[in-house]
């Protein structure tokens, strides 16, 4: 169900539960896109990734799930969950294929950042994969710091992690990077193929 709105010209942001029907087009489309781009690259199905976190991970007070609608139709969206006490992790950022190249991804990221700040977080963190260059470019142009060597090829980096401060404090890049690798190994402990893709250290 919708809990709050934030109007932006002809669009509206609707905050919902991750299992709300309004969120399902986003999750279904993401699963299809992950499958088409990665197949068995990570040693697990796209549906496994989409269902990795419980619904309440994206619920208040620690998280949120937002859908950008136009005339009641979901056209973009995203979510965040708690990474640590200071950091929100952005997830599930999506724009419908029929509405891309309209700047909607930037709107979603900005809304997630604003809501993260309202929830008390002072920095945000996110990851994307080697076969999503559009996502990488989106985060670079919206002020995110890459936590990887940008001189490497996408397949050498594998998991592209980014962070951004929401206030004037300087980012603790080594600390966030170490926490990122630790979280990946923990969350994918049952998938040795995935863990093998992750560097031992930064």
What are these regions (language model features)?
Residues 18-19, 122-125, 129-143, 148-183, ...:
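C-terminal "cap" of GNAT-fold acetyltransferases
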Residues 36, 40-70, 199-202:
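Active-site rim helix/loop that mediates acceptor-substrate recognition in acyltransferases
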Residues 1-44, 168-202:
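A short, well-structured alpha-helix characteristic of acyl/acetyltransferase catalytic modules
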Residues 65-67, 73-81, 89, 94:
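Conserved beta-strand in the GNAT
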Residues 95, 101-114, 140-141:
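Conserved acetyl-CoA-binding loop-helix of GNAT-fold acetyltransferases
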Residues 72, 103, 120:
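Conserved G/P- and acidic residue-centered "switch" motifs that form tight phosphate/ATP-binding loops
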């Amino acid at each position: 169900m919708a809990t709050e709105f934030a109007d932006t010209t002809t669009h509206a942001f609707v905050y919902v539960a991750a299992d709300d029907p309004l969120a399902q087009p986003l999750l279904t489309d993401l699963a299809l896109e992950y499958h088409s781009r990665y197949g068995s690259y990570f040693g697990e199905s796209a549906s496994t990734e989409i269902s990795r976190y419980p619904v309440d991970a994206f619920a208040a007070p620690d998280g949120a799930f937002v859908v950008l609608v136009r005339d009641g139709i979901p056209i973009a969206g995203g979510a965040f969950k708690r990474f640590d006490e200071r950091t929100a992790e952005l997830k599930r950022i999506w724009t419908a294929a029929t509405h891309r190249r309209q700047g909607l991804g930037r709107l979603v990221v900005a809304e997630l950042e604003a809501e993260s700040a309202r929830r008390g977080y002072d920095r945000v963190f996110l990851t994307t994969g080697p076969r999503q260059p559009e996502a990488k470019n989106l985060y670079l142009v919206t002020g995110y710091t890459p936590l990887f060597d940008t001189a490497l090829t996408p397949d050498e980096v594998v998991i592209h992690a980014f962070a951004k401060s929401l206030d004037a404090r300087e980012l603790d890049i080594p600390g966030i990077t170490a926490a990122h690798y630790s979280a990946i190994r923990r969350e994918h402990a049952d998938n040795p193929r995935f863990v093998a893709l992750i560097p031992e250290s930064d």
